[in-house]
């Protein structure tokens, strides 16, 4: 009797799991050769957390600013995402995707401890927290040291209505919260021997900097992923500067990645 009862419970639960959206490495890693257009739209609030949410973005206006995002391959284990004159370097290891550096005409950054972007699989309620440590230079005149903490959470799921009125179901929202401490110094102030010191990630030191420093930056990025698409269909980014404990909003911006421009419906992917 217990076995029959267990089978009934499992049978009733299966439709819930089948309907749940989930991100995985084979379907959601950036892929060489892909090209996307990010259409900037009226800034949108992300809305509530939880299940069965409805995100109605049908009234937002597409603005003139559009950005092309392309993915190319470097070697056998690095993907480069290029957008807005910046190249971001990504590396997949095990079940995770990391950012290992980025560069543009003024700034070059490389991570001693890469920044975790995803730990797959990602499903409603999953959350992972990690630390990062990076260094580089600005205009080859100033040294930059970036240290911080990121938390990636699948905090909501539901249905999304696009600016063109199309409705997407089985949508999963991923929230990435980054806390960043930045220090800049003149290049001659850093001894050459520092670059040869073995790197050791100090989590306690990062926590101390974020809690005690008079100024630090926080960014929150919400991305909506729809079933059948490798890349997000909507994105909102909010940047806030904290000065002596007081928050100053830096900017909020939103983008839509129109599904009919992605051309990457997963059931027809060749890889």
Label each PLM-derived region with a short phrase.
Residues 21-271:
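Conserved functional acidic sites
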Residues 1-24:
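Bacterial Sec-dependent N-terminal signal peptides
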């Amino acid at each position: 009797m217990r076995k029959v009862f267990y089978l009934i419970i499992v049978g009733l639960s299966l439709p819930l799991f089948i309907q749940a959206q989930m991100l995985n490495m084979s379907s959601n890693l950036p892929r060489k050769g892909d090209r996307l257009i990010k259409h900037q739209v009226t800034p949108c609030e992300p809305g509530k957390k939880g299940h069965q949410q409805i995100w109605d973005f049908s009234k937002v206006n597409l603005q003139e600013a559009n950005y092309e995002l392309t993915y190319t391959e470097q070697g056998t284990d690095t993907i480069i995402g290029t957008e807005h004159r910046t190249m971001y370097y990504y590396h997949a290891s095990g079940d995770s995707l990391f950012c290992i550096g980025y560069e543009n005409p003024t700034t070059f950054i490389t991570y001693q401890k890469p920044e975790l972007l995803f730990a797959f699989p990602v499903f409603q309620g999953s959350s992972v927290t990690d630390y990062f440590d990076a260094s580089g230079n600005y205009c080859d005149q100033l040294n930059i040291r970036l240290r911080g903490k990121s938390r990636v959470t699948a905090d909501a799921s539901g249905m999304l209505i696009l600016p063109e009125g199309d409705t997407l179901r089985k949508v999963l929202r991923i929230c990435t919260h980054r806390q960043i401490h930045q220090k800049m110094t003149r290049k001659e102030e850093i001894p050459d021997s520092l670059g040869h010191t073995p790197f050791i990630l100090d989590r306690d030191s990062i926590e101390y900097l974020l809690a005690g420093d008079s100024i630090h930056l926080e960014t929150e990025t919400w991305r909506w992923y729809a079933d059948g698409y490798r890349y997000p269909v909507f994105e909102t980014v909010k940047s806030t500067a904290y000065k002596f404990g007081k928050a100053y909003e830096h900017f909020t911006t939103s983008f839509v990645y129109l599904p009919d421009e992605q051309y990457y419906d997963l059931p027809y992917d060749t890889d």
